[in-house]
Design a protein with these regions (language model features):
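Two-metal-ion RNase H-like nuclease active-site motif
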Residues: 9-19, 127
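Nucleic-acid-processing active sites and adjacent nucleic-acid-binding tracks
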Residues: 34-53
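Conserved catalytic core of nucleotide polymerization and phosphodiester-bond processing enzymes
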Residues: 2, 15, 21, 32, ...
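Metal-dependent phosphoesterase core characteristic of DEDDh/y 3'-5' exonuclease domains
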Residues: 24, 32-34, 67-161
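Short, well-ordered alpha-helix to beta-strand connector turns
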Residues: 9, 58-59, 122
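Acidic beta-strand-to-loop metal/phosphate-binding motif
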Residues: 59-67
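N-terminal accessory regions of nucleic-acid-interacting proteins
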Residues: 1-10
Length: 161
């Protein structure tokens, strides 16, 4: 992972995604304006086109475990969006495909390498998980675990998939 000052200056967004069986949610915060950016694929709401246009416009992103998960899912969406749009997939069909890939990505993380190498991703990524060495077996920590250790006001697990 590259963290040169030039790359750090180009980051414009902090982001996270949530993938459920029938829902995809993308949330970002512009680091300059603090504007919240939201894209949803669920039921009657299908922001796929806008999400893809937005992802392609980014200079960089900051996240937690985003190199192994969030950016992988976003790259999968970008790689498949054209087919989904041409075949007129519903939001439910799209979220089903995203969910399957998400589960494969989670299962693959125990084995090693992600599907998309960092240099093949749609934009530069700064991964706080790797930057602070939480991927080291002696220090491995989840975002929820860090929130609890920092006495975060509200720390909850999502009880559904």
């Amino acid at each position: 992972m590259s963290t040169s000052p030039e790359i750090l200056r180009s980051f414009i967004e902090i982001y996270d995604i949530e993938v459920l069986r029938n829902c995809f949610l993308y949330l970002g915060i512009d680091t300059k304006s603090n504007q919240i950016i939201e894209f949803v694929i669920f039921g009657a709401r299908n922001d796929l086109r806008a999400l893809c246009r937005y992802l392609r416009s980014l200079k960089g992103q900051i996240g937690f475990n985003n190199l192994n998960y969030d950016s992988q899912v976003c790259q999968f969406i970008l790689n498949n969006s054209q087919v989904w749009l041409e075949l007129e997939y519903t939001a439910d069909q799209i979220t089903e495909e995203i969910f399957k890939f998400s589960q494969e990505t989670i299962n693959r993380s125990d084995v090693g390498f992600p599907v998309y190498s960092e240099y093949k991703l749609y934009t530069k990524q700064l991964d706080l998980y790797k930057m602070h060495h939480f991927d080291n077996r002696a220090k491995v920590q989840s975002l929820k675990g860090l929130q609890c250790n920092l006495n975060w006001k509200m720390c909850q697990e999502m009880p559904i998939d």
